[in-house]
Structures are given as structure tokens and as C-alpha cells.
Amino acid sequence: MTTQDFLLEIGCEELPPRRLNQLSQALSQTIKSELEKADLSFENIHRYATPRRLAVLVNNLALQQPQRKIERQGPSVKAAFDKDQTPTLACFGFAQSCGVSTAQLKVKKTKKGEFIYCEIEQPGQNTLDLLPNIIQSALKQLPTPKAMRWGDHKEFFVRPVHWIILMLGKDLVPATLLGKMASCETRGHRFHHPKNILVTKPDDYQKLLLTHGMVIADFEKRREKIRDLIQKAASEKGEAIIDEGLLEEVTGMVEWPVILVGNFKAEFLKLPPEVLITTMKVHQRTFPIKNKNGDLLPYFIIVSNIESKNPKRVIVGNERVINARLADASFFYDNDLRTSLENRLPKLGDVIFQRQLGTLADKARRIEKLAAFIAKQINIDEQLAARAGLLSKCDLVSEMVYEFPTLQGIMGYYYAFHDKEPPLVAEAIKEHYLPRFSGDQLPRNLLSPCVAVADRIDTIIGIIGINKSPTGDKDPFALRRAALGILRILIEKELSLDLFALLNEAKNNYAVELPNVNVVNQSFDFIIERLRAWYLEKEVPASVFMAVLASHPDDPLDFDRRIKAVQHFQTLPEADALAAANKRVSNILKKQAAELKSKTIDHSLFDSDAEHLLADQLKERAELVNNLYKKADYTKALSELASLKEPIDIFFDKVMVMVDDKEKRENRLALLSSLQQLFSQIADISLLS
């Protein structure tokens, strides 16, 4: 099959740097999807992205769709042939429209009866003709929630478009996209090579931009080059602190990276390192440098988009801005230190947490109570937990956090140390925001989780209590993230807490009456649903989750232990047979629920060895399993129960449960009920079948 390379480039004004890589991936994926939908084969796809362009190179794209066999259905057999099986006018007309003789027509049975049909070889369309619509369709699927219009164009895109390349091999694909006629010309660096560059064939695109246009088109290559240049430049002073998010953003801001090293006044090193790093990162997109001990040095790395003839001027400009920013930060910090965290509590009363739920001062007092309640459950100092909870939000009204919101908690940590609060309290103020996102680190000490869980539980109860639960993609109060944070803390830090009791306590701490009377149950269900989603991400089968859920554990850590026990149980050779047997038992007991008046087993009513064997084995295992259950050793408990496979199999082989004799029937049902209870106190194993 004949193939050619295909190139698409969309040249535009500067694209959002934080979303550039995502846009590039999406464009590549949508084009791939549309080509596959059109049945056009290709070898692979390369994507390119710089601040001024999105491009896709498709290698060895087929120049034509393959021939396809299509079936055309005609009239029914009754209409196509008369009583003598002679073709009718309808049959001749259909055959003529298909370009075949009546002898070439076939009969096919359908739900609506027998119909005649013909198979037609449909030639594939030329790729050159298909490409404009394919690209149009791909562009419509791009995630561009803030697309814009420009000039008098009706088209929308992320940024105004200035040029378009559409090439198949050496040929131009004639089309108009996003208001621009396609051409074979790209443009180089905005300052170093603003002139047009003729692309003679798609495969030369990346090389031409590099050698003629001073543009590194490949996003990944550009990012790694920047990383290498930063590390090399920093090595003369120390070691660069490379934030991956900032590196991604800077890669989206430059086409031709040039690395420069600047410095700031050493006197600013007295500021907390997080303040210095945030100032350099947020305001100037620069990378800090540290020494071998991890201490910050008064230097930073600048990633410039131009090879300046006077690099010193670029450095001085950045130094002037950073020194000014750090001078402001130093002023805010010194001002903040004049007021203790405790004395900031009244100011929290001026900040609304949520209109129906009161102020941040109200929330801080609720966290204080709930943190102490949690501390008592896990044998942590209640007074320290209460103190940390009370002060946890005080830094939100400091000048530093007002200027740098991402430093919430961190500044509270430094201010608490300055106020001579206990070190654990200071750490809890900083760590109670952890985890901030999926996969983030957890609080390190055991006091911090008390405040972290209390804060999140209070928010969940309050927001669900005023009937503002998340719906669809909308979660303005980040309740899903809060729920996942609670679960990760309790499970990964191995903290045993009754979630239902905790939610009740949180509800009672609210001074206002929450409109949602079912708030505790709904909050519990909401958190458990996040637990289900979490296990789904970990590829825990839904049947395992449902089996554990059926036993109604209120403690997330206990829930997790049961999950692991059931997963281990599934690896045992007896697992499938026992799951099937439990399902059989469950079905029998559901149908005969009315007859289970007494759950006492009467051995005198047994008339077979199989009944005695199962009853004896149950009694023997029950004591052992119940002791293991009390220790929460569910894995060993289920392993012990696996030994019941043989007596259960013998029982069902030899014994008829639903006999006419009522006493014997009810006694056998009681025996099966005891068997079910022994398993179900850990999980409903029948749901694994």
C-alpha cells in the first residue's frame, strides 16, 4: 500500500504554558482516533508543542482507504419473486441499482423475514480528500473550555491562529482551517527567526525548525534539555531544586531555552525557605539553588526564551524583581511575628467559612473539639490535639498567607514555633493539610492526623448537612478529595476509628441545626463510596468490596483488613467451592427466612454422619475463628474457615435440607444459618461466586 508522511501545524499566539502539553497530547490522540475511524492505516504519530505552535506528524499514512465490502438490502423475497420464483420488476430494479444481475443476488433471513441483498465492492476514498474533515473533527474534540474568537472570524480556538500547515508527502492539502488557508510554510522563533520557513516534506519539519528557526519543537526533548542545562548551571554553586510542575510550565513558555544564574541579597536567607522558594517560583518562574546540606543559597536559575546580546541585563532585571518581592515578604513576615497565632483567633470571626455554617472562628472551635475526640480514641494527648485544632486556621489571616495562599499551614508552623507552642502542635498546624492531592505524602506524627481528619470530617458533615453534596463533576468544596484524605490517613497510618461515631460527634459540634436530617448516614455513605473508588483504582475486584461492605464495618482500617483477608482467601484452592456453597446457603436461607424461628441446633435431630460432621467442625472452628475475629486477624480466620470445605461438600452431597419433617428441616436450616454467620462476620463470601 502506498503511504506518505502527513504534517499538521497550527501556528498561533502564545498558548497557556500550563496546559500546553495536555493540549498537544489531546490533539495527537484525537487525530489518531479520527484516522482509525476513517480506516486509514499509519505507522506512528509524533507530536510537537511550543508556545506558538501545536503540530502532529503522522508517519506512513495510507493514501487511500482499503476497499470495503458492503451489503445492500433490497425488497423482501415475497416482493422480489412471484409464485413461479421468477424475478419481479422490483427485483430487476434493485439488481440494476446495484450494477449486478438478478442471478448474483442472495437471500438473507432477518427478524423481519427473508430479504434479497447484494454485496458491493466499495473503493476506498483518497486520503487527500478525507483529511480536511478528519482534522476539523479532531479540532472540535480538543479540551478548550476557554476558547476565543479573533478579528472577524467565526472560528474558535485556544488562541488566535496565524498560520496552518497541512501537508501529505510533498503535496499541500487544500483546505481552510480555523479561518486560515493551509500552506507549506512555518515560522521560527518570534525574535531570532520571525521569517517564514518553507517545509518541503513533513519529515524535515523538526530539523528545519531547529537549524533554521531556533525552535526545539519536541516538548519532551525541550523539557529534558532545560533540566540538563539547569543542573549544569547550578552545579557551579550547588544543586538546583527542580519542581516538576514549574519545569513543565517553563517548558511551555520557551522555544529556545537559555539558562542564566542570578542572585539575591543574602540577608533574605533569614526567611523560611518555603517563602524564598515560593517567591522565586510563583513570581519569576525561577529555580532555587541549595547546598549539599539542603540549605538554600542566595542564587537562582533563570530560563530565558532569547539569546540576549546583553545577558547581564536580563539577570539584573530578574534580580531587581526578586529582591523587591523578598523585601515585601520580609516586611510581611516581621509584621506577622508581632501577633501570636492565638491573638489572631478573633480575626477569624471576620472570615466566612460558609454562609450557613458560620465563620472560620466557628470552624476552628469545632476542629478543636473533634481533634480532642479523635485523640482520645487513638490514645494521643487530647490537650495538644485540641490546641493544634484551635490554632490550625489562624495563619489564614496573616499577611504572608494573604500574599502567598499556598503557604497556609507552613507559615502557621513557623509562627507557632515563634510563639513557643509545643513542637507537635506546630507540626500539626503544618501537616493537617496533608494529603493535598492524590499520592501526596501523609502527616508524619500521630497528632497531625487528629487535626487533619477533624478538619475534613467537619467540612463533609457541614456541606452535606446543608444539602450541597457534590454532583457530577462539580465539587466546589473538594469533598471527594477530603474523603479520600481521611481514608488514606486512617488506613495507611493504621488508625482505628469508628467513622459513624466520628460523624455523629462532628454533627453535634455544630451550633446551628443542619437542615439535612440524614446528614450522618449520607456522609458515611459518601465516604464509603470514595473508599470503593479508591479500591477500584487499586484494581480490587468490585465483588471483594461488596463482600466486605455486606458485613457493615464502620472502621476504615478494619474495612481494609477485611479487604486484604478476602483477597488472600481468593488465592486458596477451596475459595471457589466455598463461595458457591455460601451462595447456595444464602439462597436457601432467604427463601426459608420465616422458618428460622430458633437458631439453636439440636444434635438429637441429626440422622446422618454428614450433619454431625458439619456441626462438630463448626463448633470446633467457631471458637478459634471468633478469637481471631476479636484480634482482627481476618486473613487467618478465613484460612481456618477454608477447612470447612470438605464437611460442607459432604453435607450437601448426603443431606436433603428441605425435608417434610418440620423439626429436622428447621434444625438443618439452623445449622446452615450458623455456618453463614461464621463467615459473614468477616465478609459475605457468597458474593464472590
UniProtKB/Swiss-Prot annotation:
Top-level enzyme category: ligase
UniProt subcellular location: Cytoplasm
Keywords, in A-Z order: Aminoacyl-tRNA synthetase, ATP-binding, Cytoplasm, Ligase, Nucleotide-binding, Protein biosynthesis
InterPro entries in UniProt: DALR_anticod-bd, Gly-tRNA-synth_bsu, Gly-tRNA-synth_heterodimer
Catalytic activity: tRNA(Gly) + glycine + ATP = glycyl-tRNA(Gly) + AMP + diphosphate
Pfam families on file: DALR_1, tRNA_synt_2f
Coiled coil: none
Gene Ontology biological process terms from the UniProt entry: arginyl-tRNA aminoacylation; glycyl-tRNA aminoacylation
Disulfide links within the chain: none
EC number, as in UniProt: 6.1.1.14
MF (Gene Ontology): arginine-tRNA ligase activity; ATP binding; glycine-tRNA ligase activity
GO cellular component, one term: cytosol
Family listed: Belongs to the class-II aminoacyl-tRNA synthetase family.
HAMAP family according to UniProt: Gly_tRNA_synth_beta (MF_00255)
Subunit structure of this chain's protein: Tetramer of two alpha and two beta subunits.
Protein name, UniProt field: Glycine--tRNA ligase beta subunit
Lineage, highest ranks first: Bacteria, Pseudomonadati, Pseudomonadota, Gammaproteobacteria, Legionellales
